[in-house]
UniProtKB/Swiss-Prot annotation:
Function statement: Beta toxins bind voltage-independently at site-4 of sodium channels (Nav) and shift the voltage of activation toward more negative potentials thereby affecting sodium channel activation and promoting spontaneous and repetitive firing. This toxin is active only on mammals. Is toxic to mice.
Alphabetically ordered keywords of this record: Amidation, Disulfide bond, Ion channel impairing toxin, Neurotoxin, Secreted, Signal, Toxin, Voltage-gated sodium channel impairing toxin
Pfam families according to UniProt: Toxin_3
Signal peptide: 1-19
Gene Ontology annotations for the cellular component aspect, listed alphabetically: extracellular region
Disulphide-bonded residues: 31-81, 35-57, 43-62, 47-64
Domain spans labelled LCN-type CS-alpha/beta: 21-82
InterPro entries: LCN-type_CS_alpha_beta_dom, Scorpion_toxin-like, Scorpion_toxin-like_sf, Scorpion_toxinL, Scorpion_toxinL/defensin
GO BP terms, alphabetized: biological process involved in interaction with host; defense response
Protein's name in the database: Toxin Tst1
Predominant cellular place of this UniProt entry's protein: secreted
Higher taxonomy: Eukaryota, Metazoa, Ecdysozoa, Arthropoda, Chelicerata
């Protein structure tokens, strides 16, 4: 039983460490990175360029998984898009 608990704990820890964060990529103005008129696969490429594991076009913006902590993702609370 103790072994099973230890095994499950290790799996959860691996998911936390390896999983990374997820969210919408931001452009240089702090807005979500648009994929509205981009070709298929654009968001996946952009996400992997940022060292993410994968990504897709969550119309109309790129959403990424497995991003490292240094990558800034869009957050409603700190949204600066269109504001000066």
């Amino acid at each position: 039983m103790k072994g099973m608990i230890l095994f499950i704990s290790c799996l959860l820890l691996i998911d936390i460490v390896v999983g990374g964060k997820e969210g919408y990529l931001m452009d240089h103005e702090g807005c979500k990175l648009s994929c509205f008129i981009r070709p298929s696969g654009y968001c996946g490429r952009e996400c992997t360029l940022k060292k993410g594991s994968s990504g897709y076009c969550a119309w109309p913006a790129c959403y990424c998984y497995g991003l490292p902590n240094w990558v800034k993702v869009w957050d409603r609370a700190t949204n600066k898009c269109g504001k000066k």
